[in-house]
Amino acid sequence: MSILELLPAIDIKNGKSVRLKQAQLDSAQQHESPSVVLSDFVAKGAKWVHLVYLDAAFKSGSNSDLVQNLIAASPIKVQLSGGIMNEDSLQKALSTKADRINIATAALQNIDWVVKAIKSNNERLTIGLDIDDGVLVARGSGEVIGDPFEYIKILDMAGCKRYVVTDNSTDGELNGPNLDLLEKVLKSTKSMIIASGGVSKLSDLKDLRRMGLDGVIVGKALYVGAIDISAAIKTCYQ
């Protein structure tokens, strides 16, 4: 069985590590400083971290220096996400030297630019697919973008290698991932899939690994102690 890449999440807002429910900023619950959280993940054996710059995603402030410094100091690989939806924000993200950049679902409103970005930076880009009730929605605003499978066809043709698929209704809820949705996405593309949202127990990770996904982003379950990160690493890699 292939490994399942584990990406523990750090969401940053106002310089603090926070967690959201269903991608809503007003649900933010504050935790420790991002650097402390990152150090803990590293000490326990994490190979990747999923770093979400919420201030950029929700246009609620700026902590770009903090994000830059975290990435520069990280001894493990970083996937950066948050507000990356045009050329300016993409270039700023690329300049951080993050190993992977996740383009926001909202960027798909300018699909021509996304296609161009994929062709220019394919090895470092993933495309976020935030899905609510079967349709793509822009995180935060909830603005409907369209049918995810129609967009996947376009993005596959452009050469997209990896998607981050989030069922917004499960994000931060600890009710388990939407396996049916993930299975449909897997069948629609040959690109790699990273699951996000809902993971609450080790058996969820086992299910996702059996499906053949490339990776999984885990946030709240780690922060509230529902999953021990050391056990999660063992489940995903051994």
Predicted regions and their residues:
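Conserved anion-binding
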Residues: K13-D26, A98-D171
